[in-house]
Amino acid sequence: MPHILIVEDETIIRSALRRLLERNQYQVSEAGSVQEAQERFSIPSFDLVVSDLRLPGAPGTELIKLAQGAPVLIMTSYASLRSAVDSMKMGAVDYIAKPFDHDEMLQAVARI
């Protein structure tokens, strides 16, 4: 069962994403910030990291370096072509805009 780390500061979004992924046979861990993720988990051990772009403290793109090769999917409500391109240039494997459609998220996760 693939193990996914969700890093999202909005509890409602984090919980909804967790439920969606768990219903679809993914094992899920979660954190509210990059710092919390670093303190609680070995980030490179995850099969996928799904992170909000704008987080308290460090941006979600910091997880790209910390993941040491584990794929990182960036999601944000600040959906712009520039944000998407910048995230991908930094090494994100994909980018998804919030609010996201459940099927769209599941397809993105399955692709990775």
Predicted regions and their residues:
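Conserved acidic carboxylate
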Residues: E8
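Short hydrophobic/Thr-rich beta-strand motif most characteristic of the beta2 strand and flanking loop
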Residues: Q25-E36, R40
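C-terminal output helix
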Residues: S80-R82, I96, F100-A110
